[in-house]
Amino acid sequence: MVQAIVRSSAHIGLSLHRNFHSMKRTILNLFVFVVCVLTGGMLNGIIVKYSSAIVPPPIGFDLTTEEGLKAAMTVMEPKHFIMPFLAHAIGTLAGAFLVTLFIKERKLFRALLVGFLFFLAGCYMVFVLPSPLWFDALDLGLAYIPMAWLGYKLAIRFSK
């Protein structure tokens, strides 16, 4: 009887240790995931912020505010949409690459989850900031999920 109680309590202790280890790994994975998404988002923001140095905005318009962007949208040419597209694509690619590199399990799922989160942010921007339909289709179709998949593939190749 005593031996059964000792074995049972040892089993419970081992079970608690495994659960703690699993919870610790889950929290660490969540932290790494959030940091990677934020890193991709910051890279996106940096590219957008400094894009006017590469492609000057239309004359007389301030693209640093939402109102300025809305006002300039009717006079913007396709060249003005290159940098926002690249910012979205590179930010997503970087976030998915980093997630794949640093998280040990379910890499593809997590990389695509990064792409999906960025895709949701892109959908939000489509509703908030009216832009040409061709840009919305290109951006939503190519800058998020495909770039997350590419980030995953590059990280797998890089880590070999």
Question: Positions of the model-derived regions?
Answer:
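Short, Lys/Arg-enriched N-terminal segments with co-localized hydrophobic residues
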Residues: R7-S22
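Juxtamembrane/disordered regions of integral membrane proteins
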Residues: H21-K160
